[in-house]
Amino acid sequence: MTKDQFLTELNSYLSVLKPEDRKNTIEFYKEYFEDAENEEAAIEELGSPKKLAEEIIDFHKTSYRGENTQVSRQFSPDESISEIILNITAAKVLINASQEEKIEYNTQNIADDDFSAKIENGKLVIKEKPVFFFSKKGFVSFLENFNINTSSNTSKREILINIPKDTHLEKLEFNSQMGSLKIEEVNIEVIEGYTTCGNFVVKSGIHKKIDFNTSAGAINISDMDIETMKLSSSAGAIKFENIKAGNISASTGAGTIDFIKTESSYINANSGAGNITGNELKSDRGKFNTGAGTNKFQKCDFNEAILNTGAGSIIFQGNLHSYAKINSAIGSVDLNLPDKVENYDINIFSKQGSVKLNGENVEGRGDRLNLGSKTSDTNIKISTTFGKIKISTQEGE
């Protein structure tokens, strides 16, 4: 069987799908063959066109079947619930505080057979049945790349959970393939989980720990005091706003990391490709790394700080108290400090690039310079391989 024969057969078996779904599916498998190194091996991996078509049709039929379906339920106050476990395939989950005395849930566009909720030993376990079958690598790849939002109704599958406002849950666990999670004004001691493709949002509420990962999706945390957070996204932005924390760890393979009006004893932020920004950010110890991107901080206050970028600029305006290490392999450094230069011990290494202090060129021997006073309690080390260095202090204002 050739590639063209395979696609023709597959197309005929998919005749029951909506035209747009059918077209998008065939286009995907055309690209699949184009990317394959060996046509025969790709066909063997996919299996028979008929079997593959059955799996794809089942995926779409489940979505069609749940359209416009609504289910709701209230749990009795006598049913004690301390934890919630959510095993989700593709639904958007919203968890809100309510004025009611009972925990309740509502679903939208999820068929009855695809949803279950029960209490087990104080745990509310909610499951959304998988809407697809992972039997072959090719079909898994299809699901990872297929435009679900425009081609089926999984984007409209929704679960709304209302929690009485005075309730304090010990833990919430969220495990999802293509679903998102938003929690607002609900008190949950520990929140943890992952989503392969979807966003994660937590706003307000009383929390101790958040540990969450998304392979492809944005993370947004706001308006809370918390002990520790560990957040990661392979491809997506991470944003903190109005936060007071003990420890923050944030990493993204490709995306920005933003801190707005945030205070934390310790911060470790890493972006493989994307900017890291801070506005009114305060930390006792902060480490900020970008592989390719700008580090930009305004109105910030650090006791100890390490700012690194492989390819990109570093811009800092604010207070540095004890120690700062600023490194840019390819990119400029712009440092704006509030005190006089003699209140800092500044050590500069610049392989290629000019150094300016308050608008004036600084000349020195070789590639190393010292500015300020060696007796200062604030030590700042600046290093660039290719990039200009600009320093502004109180005298230059």
Which residues does each PLM region occupy?
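A composition-biased, non-transmembrane "mature-region" signal
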Residues: 12, 47-50, 134, 155
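Amphipathic, heptad-repeat alpha-helical segments
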Residues: 2-19
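Short, surface-exposed interaction patches in beta-rich subdomains
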Residues: 129, 151-153, 157-158, 162-167, ...
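Short, charged early-sequence alpha-helical segments and their helix-coil boundaries
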Residues: 37-68
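Residue-level detector of well-ordered alpha-helical segments, enriched
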Residues: 21-25, 52
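Short linear S-[DN]-x-LW-Φ motif typified by the pepsin-like aspartic protease active-site region
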Residues: 23, 64-129, 135, 149-194, ...
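Amphipathic alpha-helical segments that form the core helices of the histone-fold
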Residues: 25-40
